[in-house]
């Protein structure tokens, strides 16, 4: 036993000597590397940018359930009891885009229903903030820091110059942990079809984005803003490397409108259309898979005056190729009325270009699922009743869709939602922004006034 112990001790000593020798050899390496160029790092860029990315804290009260009118309870029973408004707190991120004015860009869903908004900088300072304006369709909101001092603003890049494979860095306040930076690449551009409410024309990235990152910055390696982090695809509730950001050009345009008008003024192209598909390409004998197929041109619209025709395929907008109808809709909806845009078309297989002046009319149209998924399959527009009253006209209902199953029919006119009178799509959006558990639509159909109920 004694010999064994000595042997183990000797082995230990031997190993110790060997490790020490190895350590001495390794220890000399840093001295050799010190004279070489420094390792690549994002630290210098982030040191300049982090002061411009802020944490957004909101407080407010929200109803936990929609009060059900007595006359409707017989249809739904008492399984949705009335709930009093409950206080809530929320966390998100934001980006300072104007230091002297204290303007901060964030997501609409971060500040929705907030009654108090506060901003915390990365140096620990806190400020109260007020809402300048917001837009639920694009999920953009503009805040203003009260009594700002010694702020840092972020430079904004041209997101139209992005390419798939460009490096990207996401900065925000995930889970309330504090400022966090993650890196990745631009995975895709013009991403749509995510079944989100509103406009979809996203930058996709694999830079990790989590809850609390909403409203934060997506940056290029120069530290310039290329997007506002907005959503993630998260089957399990956490990041799986598929995040989405609103392009900086779109965010900048919307922010300027909110500064100038306090709201978003949308241009109207005056067409109805759908995504280009292999079936459409085959039917028209075309070798094109991307773009927007024009199914109808509204009479008297800017497109009609410019000569756009049903059956045309819109392949580009202002010289930039279009991937989808969703991208076209998103880009037009963030352009002011009266703006002239150039459309690249394919007609009978031949390319041509037309210039369209976006309508300045206050009329509006929208796919109903952009307002609430319960109305998916219906196309809406601001309309008029026979007596001159205003409402929301049902232009089209897709057979078998949720809207059709709920009982909506073409030419119905919605005049009320949950006892609130609505005269326009904009007013309907505001009523449904609270996401009521029960939706009761008051509809004029011919000479009758009826109610349709849906969850």
UniProtKB/Swiss-Prot annotation:
Catalytic reaction equation(s): Acts on substrates that are at least partially unfolded. The cleavage site P1 residue is normally between a pair of hydrophobic residues, such as Val-|-Val
GO MF annotations in UniProt: identical protein binding; peptidase activity; serine-type endopeptidase activity
PROSITE patterns according to UniProt: PDZ
Subcellular location as annotated: Periplasm
EC number of this enzyme: 3.4.21.107
Active site positions, chain numbering: 109 (charge relay system), 139 (charge relay system), 214 (charge relay system)
pH-linked activity: Optimum pH is 5.5. The degradation is efficient at pH values between 4.5 and 6.
Activity regulation summary: Inhibited by diisopropylfluorophosphate (DFP).
Enzyme class per UniProt: hydrolase
Position of the signal peptide: 1-27
TM annotation in the entry: none
Keywords: Hydrolase, Periplasm, Protease, Repeat, Serine protease, Signal, Stress response
Domain PDZ: 258-349, 355-447
InterPro entries registered for this protein in UniProt: PDZ (IPR001478), PDZ_sf (IPR036034), Pept_S1C_Do (IPR011782), Peptidase_S1_PA (IPR009003), Peptidase_S1C (IPR001940)
SMART domains, per the entry: PDZ
Cellular component per GO, a single term: periplasmic space
Pfam families associated with the record: PDZ, Trypsin_2
Gene3D superfamilies the record matches: 2.30.42.10, 2.40.10.120
GO biological process: protein quality control for misfolded or incompletely synthesized proteins; proteolysis; proteolysis involved in protein catabolic process
Complex and partners: DegQ can reversibly switch between different oligomeric forms that represent inactive (6-mer) and active (12- and 24-mer) protease states. Substrate binding triggers the conversion of the resting DegQ trimer and hexamer into catalytically active 12- and 24-mers. The conversion of 6-mer (DegQ6) into 12-mer (DegQ12) or 24-mer (DegQ24) is crucial in regulating protease activity.
Similarity annotation: Belongs to the peptidase S1C family.
Role, per record: DegQ could degrade transiently denatured and unfolded proteins which accumulate in the periplasm following stress conditions. DegQ is efficient with Val-Xaa and Ile-Xaa peptide bonds, suggesting a preference for a beta-branched side chain amino acids. Only unfolded proteins devoid of disulfide bonds appear capable to be cleaved, thereby preventing non-specific proteolysis of folded proteins. DegQ can substitute for the periplasmic protease DegP.
PANTHER family, per the entry: SERINE PROTEASE FAMILY S1C HTRA-RELATED (PTHR22939), SERINE PROTEASE HTRA2, MITOCHONDRIAL (PTHR22939:SF129)
Protein name: Periplasmic pH-dependent serine endoprotease DegQ
Name of the gene: degQ
């Amino acid at each position: 036993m004694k010999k064994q112990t000595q042997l183990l001790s000797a082995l230990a000593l031997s190993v110790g000597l060997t490790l020490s020798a190895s350590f001495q050899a390794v220890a000399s390496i840093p001295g050799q590397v010190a004279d070489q160029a420094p390792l690549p790092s994002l630290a210098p860029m982030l040191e300049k940018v982090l002061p411009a990315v802020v944490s957004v804290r909101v407080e407010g009260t929200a109803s936990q359930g929609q009060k059900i009118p007595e006359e409707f309870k017989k249809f739904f029973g008492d399984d949705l009891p009335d709930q009093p408004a409950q206080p809530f707190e929320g966390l998100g991120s934001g980006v300072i885009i104007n230091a002297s004015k204290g303007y901060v860009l964030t997501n609409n869903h971060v500040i929705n229903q907030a009654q108090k908004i506060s901003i915390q900088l990365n140096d620990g300072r806190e400020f109260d903030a007020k809402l300048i304006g917001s837009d639920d369709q694009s999920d953009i909101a503009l805040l203003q820091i009260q009594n700002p001092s010694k702020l840092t603003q972020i430079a904004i890049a041209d997101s139209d110059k992005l390419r798939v494979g460009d490096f990207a860095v996401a900065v925000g306040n995930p889970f309330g942990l504090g400022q966090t930076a993650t890196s990745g690449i631009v995975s895709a551009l013009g991403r749509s079809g995510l079944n989100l409410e509103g406009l979809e024309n996203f930058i996709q990235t694999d830079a990790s984005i989590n809850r609390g990152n909403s409203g934060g910055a997506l940056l290029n390696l120069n530290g310039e803003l290329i997007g506002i982090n907005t959503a993630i695809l998260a089957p399990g509730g956490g990041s799986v490397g598929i995040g989405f950001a609103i392009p900086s050009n779109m965010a900048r345009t919307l922010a300027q409108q909110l500064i100038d008008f306090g709201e978003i003024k949308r241009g109207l192209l005056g067409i109805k259309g759908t995504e280009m598909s292999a079936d459409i390409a085959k039917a028209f004998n075309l070798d094109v898979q991307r773009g927007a197929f024009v199914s109808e041109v509204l009479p008297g619209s800017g497109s009609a005056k410019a000569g756009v025709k049903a059956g045309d395929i819109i392949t580009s907008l202002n010289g930039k190729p279009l991937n989808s109808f969703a991208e076209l809709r998103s880009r037009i909806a963030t352009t002011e009325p009266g703006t002239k845009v150039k459309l690249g078309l394919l007609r009978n297989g031949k390319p041509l270009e037309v210039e369209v002046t976006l309508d300045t009319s206050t009329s509006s149209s929208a796919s109903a699922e952009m307002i609430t998924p319960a109305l998916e399959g219906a196309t809406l527009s601001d309309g008029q009743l026979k007596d001159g009253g205003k409402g929301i006209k049902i232009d089209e209902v897709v057979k078998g869709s949720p809207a059709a199953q709920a009982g909506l029919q073409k030419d119905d006119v919605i005049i009320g939602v949950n006892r609130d009178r609505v005269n326009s799509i904009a007013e309907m959006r505001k009523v449904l922004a609270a996401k009521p558990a029960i939706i009761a639509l008051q509809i004029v159909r011919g000479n009758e006034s009826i109610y349709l109920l849906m969850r």
